[in-house]
């Protein structure tokens, strides 16, 4: 009987410990890990390639874009293509977008005249029909 009682107590304590660990784990996962973009300068560029079905052109653009976002003043970057979403307010006509964030306008100004940025334009401008830029700062 003593063995059964000890086993039962062990199981109950183990269950409580597991439940407590689960609660702690769940609360740790629910913390807000969102990156705060407040105060940053956001530069978002959309490109429409002349021939988006040309794989050689796409490869050339992607390689150049990956080099472009290595500029030192860029805090974070994202090179993307239209997401597979369909709503009336979404424009999916562009071929690529490049999003980059900067500490301030001065760092973005450095980017604008940086040799890697100028090389990107020189090497790829023959690939696109249209470029549209949206810059924004926090409210």
Predicted regions located by residue number:
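N-terminal secretory signal peptides and thylakoid transit peptides that target proteins
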Residues: 1-18
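C-terminal segment of N-terminal export signals and the immediately downstream linker at the start
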Residues: 26-56
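Short, glycine- and small/hydrophobic-rich beta-strand elements in well-ordered beta-sheets
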Residues: 28-33, 66-95, 132-138
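Short, well-ordered beta-strand segments in beta-rich or mixed alpha/beta enzyme
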Residues: 40-49, 80, 87-112
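Short amphipathic alpha-helical segments
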Residues: 53-79, 115-125
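Surface-exposed, polar helix/loop patches in the mature regions of secreted/periplasmic/lumenal proteins
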Residues: 100-138
